[in-house]
Amino acid sequence: MQEQSGGQQLFGQISDDTALLSLLQGSESDHGNALTDFISWCDDNFLDLNVSKTKELIIDFRRNRNTAKECIIHKESMEIVTSYKYLGTIFDDHLKFDINTEAIVKRGQQRIHLLRKLNSFSVSPVILCSFYQSFIESLLSFSFICWFHSLTVKDRNSLNSIVNICSKITGVKQRDLNYFCNRQIIKKAAGILASSGHVLKSEFSVLPSGRRYALPACRTNRHSKSFIPSAIRLLNAP
């Protein structure tokens, strides 16, 4: 992670996937010098930017949204999209993750067919459960600590229906996604607290009692269901 001047821009790079995150305030409508500097750095280091695959996703919850300024890379306009898949998760411009859930459910149903085929060979429940955990549960739980609590009841039921179907096929009750997600959130939060240099550690502030963490003030339901508030509520639970 690399923070730009003023703390308003942040570069995140995982392997060859690079994301520029900009916090625009007031009348700001572009990435400032951060994008220009990044393009120049790529040119200086003989790296080609594929403009056709470079997208811009604008997340703005204000009632009066500013008109986005068109970004130009080497005289080519960057396409503005309403959803984008980054590191295996589909983000939309309202952070509802319903599109991501639909994609997961579709792929999960395809893998249920494979589980049924495997069951038709009369293999042991141990092998069926191993297949489920490796190919289906891993799909349902990928990055879900970031988005599961933000889902609507309908989307949660769609995911849980896959778990219920797989439980019937394997003959073994598979773990509930809500319980599994809460356990993973606590595990992730513990990892953040144990790391002195983690960027999110400052979000966990201990109350004067020394036994509980201060819950951030959440003005929206969306913020309340995000990772940090959810993690603090679980850590404070008796």
PLM region spans:
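Hydrophobic packing residues in well-ordered alpha-helices of helical domains and bundles
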Residues: 11-14, 28-35, 49, 101, ...
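Catalytic palm subdomain of template-directed nucleic-acid polymerases
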Residues: 18-43
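Active-site palm subdomain of RNA-directed nucleic acid polymerases
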Residues: 1-22, 139
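Conserved pre-motif C helix in the palm subdomain of viral-like polymerases
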Residues: 1-7, 96, 127, 133, ...
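Short linear motifs embedded in intrinsically disordered, charge-biased segments
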Residues: 154-238
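Short, conserved micro-motifs composed of acidic
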Residues: 27, 36, 40, 48-82
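Hydrophobic, well-ordered secondary-structure elements that form the walls
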Residues: 42, 56, 136, 166, ...
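Basic, alpha-helical interaction scaffolds
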Residues: 75-145
